[in-house]
Amino acid sequence: MRPFTKHTGLAAPLDLANVDTDMIIPKQFLKSIKRTGFGKNLFDELRYEDEGQPDQECDGRPLRKDFVLNQDRYKGASVLLARQNFGCGSSREHAPWALDDYGFRSIIAPSFADIFYNNCFKNGLLPIVLQAEEVDQLFAEVALREGAQVIVDLENQTVSSPSGATFEFNVDNFRKHCLLNGLDDIGLTLQQDAAIRRYEEKRMNDAPWLFLPRGQ
């Protein structure tokens, strides 16, 4: 998992409340258990005029020109501004996979659905909860200037707007540690590699019959 320390990126404003996980990545794309390849179908029903299908190429599909990610000024956005209750609905982990695969590093909203919020941290995305009026200010500033960037500083737990206004956010210390160091569940387990080896060696000494080849 990529570490997240400080990120400066183009912000895209998704001005919709209660965006659920089926809107983020529709159900027909959930067959794969690989974490990659979902970006082209992120917000599929909002981005495209037609209904997308698994393994379908998206280059020739008709776009909804009014959707934020289809507008030239927001191409390459890596910070998503959202409204309240983002990520509600089913608990599909494919939702943060799709956001990450598209290129987003952080999502800023007044509130998130709990399971989606937790899944973001496990997949290297930083979900940030700010006050509604602070999110409103970010939306307003991003709309005013093309190419407006937002600075997300995890170490200092601040978000800086395009005008330089700074907003503080809270994050659990353990989750912060994991993101700063790029540690997912596997990475955390590997940190205990020496202790795991010692345990296995002790088990082999205490109960060697458990480790005999089958049939012996």
Swiss-Prot record:
Enzyme Commission number: 4.2.1.33
Entry keyword annotation includes Amino-acid biosynthesis: yes
A GO CC annotation given for this chain: 3-isopropylmalate dehydratase complex
An annotated Gene Ontology molecular function: 3-isopropylmalate dehydratase activity
InterPro entries recorded: 3-IsopropMal_deHydase_ssu (IPR004431), Aconitase/3IPM_dehydase_swvl (IPR015928), AconitaseA/IPMdHydase_ssu_swvl (IPR000573), IPMI_Swivel (IPR033940), LeuD (IPR050075)
PANTHER family: 3-ISOPROPYLMALATE DEHYDRATASE SMALL SUBUNIT, 3-ISOPROPYLMALATE DEHYDRATASE SMALL SUBUNIT 2-RELATED-RELATED
Family: Belongs to the LeuD family. LeuD type 1 subfamily.
UniProt-recorded name of the protein: 3-isopropylmalate dehydratase small subunit
